[in-house]
């Protein structure tokens, strides 16, 4: 079956890589997997060897092939539709998928939620994504790729880049390399008192990279108040956004939000 560009289709055909993806999920008795965009069913077949699978597929050609291939297996449920419009299947507690790169962001948001409304229903989420995106998601503080996306997702889940997948493992080969990431949603050891404030802080902090944080937040919070918060948290007054860990961002947000919102602050303001 030929691929359709509008669906961002690239068939993963390397058996060793497929096996590593399944292994990364650590599947156990009682698990039920949500697979997004199963395509030709190469990953589906391996998942079904261990656990039941609920698959969501938008391409009618793939739906017909999957029904022929797995329709007789009672542990396989196929939903024809758009994952961004469909409700997440209730029984599934694990996600394993090779997702379309052109809608990776919306899919991640669908699976993990937002800072204000996190989704914790999945035990683990294993996704094949564009390598650059995987690096940004799992980036540590101080690294070149650490940014607003890193902070938001690492607040919601433990984020790991497990291994890279070269383009020749796909048909047709994408123009970029890929990577497998694992997200483990977690109860928060450090909870933001006001997630909307944290979201706005992160957005403004990373609006201009390499700029000192106190300058990024100028006009949003009084400099005197900001420097006092820095001092109380042992944050350098010359710190940049990329220097702060997720925990530090939460602590700073909590400290700044102890009083009224600073003049001009927008709840949930997102520009990054």
UniProtKB/Swiss-Prot annotation:
It catalyses: adenosine(1518)/adenosine(1519) in 16S rRNA + 4 S-adenosyl-L-methionine = N(6)-dimethyladenosine(1518)/N(6)-dimethyladenosine(1519) in 16S rRNA + 4 S-adenosyl-L-homocysteine + 4 H(+). GO terms for cellular component: cytosol. HAMAP family: 16SrRNA_methyltr_A (MF_00607). InterPro entries: KsgA/Erm (IPR001737), rRNA_Ade_diMease-like_C (IPR023165), rRNA_Ade_Mease_Trfase_CS (IPR020596), rRNA_Ade_methylase_Trfase_N (IPR020598), rRNA_adenine_dimethylase (IPR011530), SAM-dependent_MTases_sf (IPR029063). Belongs to the class I-like SAM-binding methyltransferase superfamily. rRNA adenine N(6)-methyltransferase family. RsmA subfamily. SUPFAM superfamilies: S-adenosyl-L-methionine-dependent methyltransferases. GO terms for molecular function: 16S rRNA (adenine(1518)-N(6)/adenine(1519)-N(6))-dimethyltransferase activity; RNA binding; rRNA (adenine-N6,N6-)-dimethyltransferase activity. Keywords: Cytoplasm, Methyltransferase, RNA-binding, rRNA processing, S-adenosyl-L-methionine, Transferase. Specifically dimethylates two adjacent adenosines (A1518 and A1519) in the loop of a conserved hairpin near the 3'-end of 16S rRNA in the 30S particle. May play a critical role in biogenesis of 30S subunits. Its EC number is 2.1.1.182. S-adenosyl-L-methionine binds at residues 10, 12, 37, 57, 82, 98. NCBIfam families: ksgA. Coiled coil: none annotated. One of its GO terms (biological process) is rRNA methylation. The gene is rsmA. Gene3D superfamilies: Ribosomal RNA adenine dimethylase-like, domain 2 (1.10.8.100), Vaccinia Virus protein VP39 (3.40.50.150). This is Ribosomal RNA small subunit methyltransferase A. CDD domains: AdoMet_MTases. PANTHER family: DIMETHYLADENOSINE TRANSFERASE, DIMETHYLADENOSINE TRANSFERASE-RELATED. It is found in: Cytoplasm.
């Amino acid at each position: 079956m030929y691929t359709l560009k509008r669906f961002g289709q690239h068939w993963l055909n390397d058996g060793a890589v497929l096996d590593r993806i399944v292994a990364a999920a650590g599947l156990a008795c009682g698990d039920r997997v949500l697979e997004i965009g199963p395509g030709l069913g190469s990953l589906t077949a391996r998942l079904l060897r261990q656990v039941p699978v609920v698959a969501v597929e938008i391409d009618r050609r793939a739906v017909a092939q999957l029904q022929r291939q797995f329709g007789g297996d009672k542990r396989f449920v196929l939903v024809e539709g758009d994952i961004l419009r469909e409700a997440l299947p209730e029984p599934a507690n694990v996600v394993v998928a090779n997702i379309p790169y052109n809608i990776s962001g919306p899919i991640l948001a669908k699976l993990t939620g937002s800072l204000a409304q996190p989704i914790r229903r999945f035990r683990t989420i294993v996704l094949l994504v564009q390598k650059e995106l995987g690096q940004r998601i799992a980036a540590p503080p101080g690294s070149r790729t650490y940014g607003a996306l890193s902070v938001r997702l690492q607040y919601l889940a433990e984020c790991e880049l497990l291994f890279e997948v070269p383009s020749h493992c796909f048909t047709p080969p994408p123009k970029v390399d890929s990577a497998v990431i694992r997200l483990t949603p977690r109860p928060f050891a450090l909870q933001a008192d006001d997630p909307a404030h944290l979201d706005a802080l992160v957005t403004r902090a990373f609006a201009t990279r390499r700029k000192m944080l106190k300058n990024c937040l100028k006009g949003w919070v009084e400099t005197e108040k900001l420097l006092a918060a820095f001092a109380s948290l042992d944050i350098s007054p010359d710190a940049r956004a990329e220097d702060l860990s997720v925990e530090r961002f939460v602590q700073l947000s909590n400290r700044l939000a102890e009083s009224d919102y600073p003049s001009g602050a927008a709840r949930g303001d997102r520009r990054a």
